[in-house]
């Protein structure tokens, strides 16, 4: 698995966590098997008795859909921003002014 594949898989795992409630059962099943459980397209096709191409198309469309949700709702992006601010806060624990600034940044995200 290349670094780009790993980054995409990690991103899709996060997007799945944030947006799975907005997906159909079939979409959830396909994404979960492909990205979380590392099933191949053929294994998923055999499991659901459909063609490999049907699985590929569904995963691609569903991936596009969760990316669209992220563009509109920005749940993952804001999660990443909050995580970075928390890390900065931990590093600045002795600086009250910096902590106040980070708290204000967190408030702006909400």
From Swiss-Prot:
Which organism encodes this protein?
Answer: Staphylococcus carnosus (strain TM300)
Q: Please give the name of this protein.
A: UPF0122 protein Sca_0859
Q: A Pfam family for this UniProt protein? A: UPF0122
- What the protein does? Might take part in the signal recognition particle (SRP) pathway. This is inferred from the conservation of its genetic proximity to ftsY/ffh. May be a regulatory protein.
Recorded family membership: Belongs to the UPF0122 family.
